[in-house]
Amino acid sequence: MIDARDVTAVVVTYNRLPLLRRCLAALQAQTAQGLRVLVVDNASADGTAEYLKTLAMPGLVCRILTENLGGAGGFAYGMQAAAELGCKAVWLMDDDTLPEPQALEALLAADAAMDGAYGWLSSRALAPDGSDQPMNLQRKTMYRDIDGFDGKEIPAVMASFVSLFLRMDTVRQFGLPIAEFFIWSDDWEYTRRISRCKPCRVIPASRVVHAMQNPGIVNIARDVPERWARYRYFYRNDVVLYRREGGAGWLWLLAKDAWHTVQVLRDSRGRRAERIGIIWKGFAAGVKFRPQTPYLP
């Protein structure tokens, strides 16, 4: 049986110090006491490193990086660092994740009830207004979100890193997130990698608020112009994720990217050729992209 003292929360942060402060306060307020917290600072330039160096928080471990590894690289780095600390389980989250006080307690109860016979456990993610966060709805299949949050546990095949709990034995078996993804789809690829072989569950009693700065569906046709360039990672990484599903995965990719192209053409904000180029250049890059699965040393 695992208790909070066996768990390391891995928090990846980048230039969001006000949100990080709230995340750490929420972790300190957990009813399951004794949690270690490992913060990976992705070379922030907003005073995060200085803040962490002066923070007197029990169980806090900081890793200050000299370059931004992205969310994918940050979680891969943090999970390896957590393994070196000797923990039995990791609890992954972004710096804008605000766990409710009983979030970890509910995950630990589910772990005990299942006696560790699972791949990962995922929390219910809420928007600040209390509604379900659409960006973080788990998938019951590769193509459909779960139907709701009724019951003690819900089968799922993919989930985000907003609040993901897994044992270190699972990490040793299935490896680490693919750092080369940098951002986007690293969490879905990782959770799908595990769910192919082990049952995975959503635990509705474990609740977190995802205080996203840019809420909504990931789509270059809807997002703000300042974020368009980074979508090359999204369209590239999705190819790696879905091609493993065979013909159905390729059809899904082509249909999704074609639909996003149509939406861009309908968008009145302009720069349509640029955005369509990002979609299909990302797709082409994904066809050639063959990253290796990293494992703990």
Predicted regions and their residues:
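A short, conserved alpha-helix in the catalytic core of glycosyltransferases
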Residues: 164, 170-175, 180-206
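A recurrent flexible, glycine/aromatic-enriched loop bordering the glycosyltransferase active site
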Residues: 147-166
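Conserved donor nucleotide-binding strand/loop of the catalytic core
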Residues: 53-73, 77, 81-84
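A conserved acidic beta->alpha catalytic loop
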Residues: 26, 41-50, 97-98
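Conserved donor NDP-sugar-binding/catalytic core segment of glycosyltransferases
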Residues: 102-135
